[in-house]
Amino acid sequence: GDGIYKSIDAGNSWKNVGLKTSEHIAKIIIDPENTDNIYVAAQGPLWRSGGQRGLYNSNDGGKSWNRILHVSDDTGISDVVMDQNDNDILYASTYQRRRHFGILVAGGPEGGIYKSVDRGQTWKKLKAGLPGGDIGRIGLAISPQKSNVVYALITAKEETKGFYRSGDY
């Protein structure tokens, strides 16, 4: 891919609004309280380091973008979720991946789950109750009834991969 596209006429026409070197966009969420506030999970290029990897935020409807979470030039963001009961709270999952001739590195020690309580200004890596070591792709969800219940579907080693639930984040 070549970035984020936006339509203001119900999909009749589209305009590229940035993140052209992200190549792989995993998710886009729009703040329900302010539709100009957009979060984009960018995985980055598969075949090389760099590109626009990380979690990006636009406060002006896509006119400008700021990277608000970045781990490394080989690790992108595979998911981002916003607490529907408190839009200040975000969770994001990181995914370290690279394709080389004949192999795909689909996970590594930089994979994990991060939490922000200030709309992405600061982040804390969550570790309690989660697997360590090489982590692959992670899918996230927050319970709409109980915001402190967070679900994660984690690809990892055979003994640690699986469906995780926390009731205290």
Feature-to-residue mapping (PLM):
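Beta-propeller blade termini and top-face loops
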Residues: 1-169
